[in-house]
Amino acid sequence: MLLDVNTNHTLMHDAHVHEHCLIKSIRDDGALHSWSDSSKVFYPKSFYATATNKKNNKLASASMNKTATSNRTVSDEIYFHSTKPQFDGQGSAERTRTLTKRNSFKRTRILKARDDSELLNENRSSLMTPSLSSVMSQVRKTNSAKTLSGECPIHEGHLTQSIKRKFSEEAQSDCSSLSSSKLHPLTDDIADAVDLQTPAIGDEVLAEPVVPKMKIININDLDLFDDWEVKDLVDIFPPVYERRPRSSSALSLVSASSDAKLRPTSVDFQIIDKKGGKTSRRKSRSKSTTENMIYENDLVELEQWPSASPSPETDGSIASSELLPNKRIRQKSLNTNFLKLYSIETSCKRKSILPEVEVDDHLLKQLTYSEIRSLEIKKEPNVSTNDIKLALITRKKLWSDMVHETRNDLFGDSTPWNLHFVATTSNTEPSQGRESASEHATADLKSSLVRVHSDVKPWFNNGGTMLKPCGKLNLGKVTNKTSAPTREIQYVVKGWCDSRFL
C-alpha cells in the first residue's frame, strides 16, 4: 500500500530528525535513478520500505528488536554519522556516538523491513496495471524537470503530491474506477488541457444542426412488427431495379465475341392434315444464320409430347361399387438405338447438313412416312426439299417411334383370354327362330363349336357356364380351392381370332 510519506513516516518514527536524515540519505544514495524505469511503476525503490501498512511495520519492528545488536554494521554507523554535523569537544563526541547508535538501530530495522516488504510488493505489483493517463503525466513532469535543470530534482512537496494514490487502489484499479466521478490524482495536466480546450463563457458557441435519423424501408419488407404512419414518410423513391415481364418465347441476344456456335437455318412450313382438313403452322423464331440468336426452349431436349390416342374420359360423378382394376404402370423408356440416332442428328445439324425444322410434333406423329415423302414443301433458298423431308422423317423416328411414353396397363390385359376375340367364319347373325338339329351335323364352313350369339356350351346340357373363344382349361382335379390346379391348358376356339389380326 503506497501511503503518504509524511503521515506514514511520522507514525513509524515520531522524530523529525530521523525523517530529515532519511530523505537526505535517499538523495545522496542515488535512489532516484529508478524514477524513469517503467517496470517499477515510476516510484523510487527506497520508498518501498515506507510503503507497508501498519501491520507489517509492527511485525517487522517486533522481529527486528530481537536481533538489533547483531544486525548493526559499521557501514550504517559511518553512513548515519556522516549525515549529521560534527561537534567539537568530548561532550559533542559522546552525543554524536549516542545519536549514531540510536540512528543505526532504526536504520537496521528499516532495512530489514525493506527486505521483507520488497518481496511482498513485487508479488503485488505484478497485479498492478497503471493507467495510461498517470504514466503519461509522470513522463511529462520528468521531461519538463530535466529540460529546466539538466537533471531530475525532486522536492518534498512534488514527491508527496506524486505518491497520493494508495497501493490498494493500484491493485484494484479497472475501467470502472477510472471512469468514476473521483478525479485521478495524477491527471492534473490532462484536466488542465481539457480546461484549455473548453471555450470561455463570453465566447460564442455555434450550435450544430441536429440531423434527424432517417431509415430507408422497402415496402415489400414491412412486417407486423413495424408501426409507421403517413406523417413518418419523408420521401418516396422508385425501386432500384424493376423486373420486366418477359414471355417464354423471347430471344436473348448473344454478343459477337461469344463462343456460341451458329445454329443452322430454320424452316417454317405448313402441314395439311388430310383427315381433318386443318392446317398447323408454327412460327419460326430464328431469322437467318447471320444473326447470333439462341433458343431458350432448346435447353430441354427430352420433352414429353401428348399421346396421339387420348385415353377415354370417364365420368367421375358416377360412383361405382365395383373394385378398381389393378393397373401396372409402364415407365417411359427409350430404344437401344435412340442415342445413336440422336448423336447423328445433332452432328448433322451442327454441320448444317440437316436444317432446323419447326413443326408441330403432335401432328407429325399422326403422319406416316409415305405421307411425309408426299408432302408439298415450299422451296427455300438455302435448303432443298429433300433435306427438309429427311429432317422430318428423322425427327418422327427419333421422338415418336423410339420413345415409349408412360402409360397404365391393366393387370392381365395382355393375356390371351382377356383380349377381344371375333368370329371369322360367321359374319351374319342367324335367324331368331329355333335352330334345326341338323345344323351342327352338316359340314358347314361357317360353323363353330361355340354358338356365336349364345353363352351356352353345346356339349354341356346341364350347365350354363360360358365358354370363351380363348381361355384355359383345368385338366387336373382341384383338391383345395385356395391352391392352383396342377395342370392347365390354353385353347382357342376354331373360327375365332384376335381383333388385332383383322
From Swiss-Prot:
Main location (coarse class): cytoplasm
Record bears the keyword Cytoplasm: yes
Keywords: Cytoplasm, Nucleus
Coiled coil regions, renumbered to chain: none
GO BP term, example: intracellular signal transduction
Protein localization: Cytoplasm; Nucleus
Gene Ontology annotations for the cellular component aspect, listed alphabetically: cytoplasm; nucleus
Miscellaneous information on this protein: Present with 1055 molecules/cell in log phase SD medium.
UniProt name for this protein: Protein GIS3
Natural source organism: Saccharomyces cerevisiae (strain ATCC 204508 / S288c)
Gene designation: GIS3
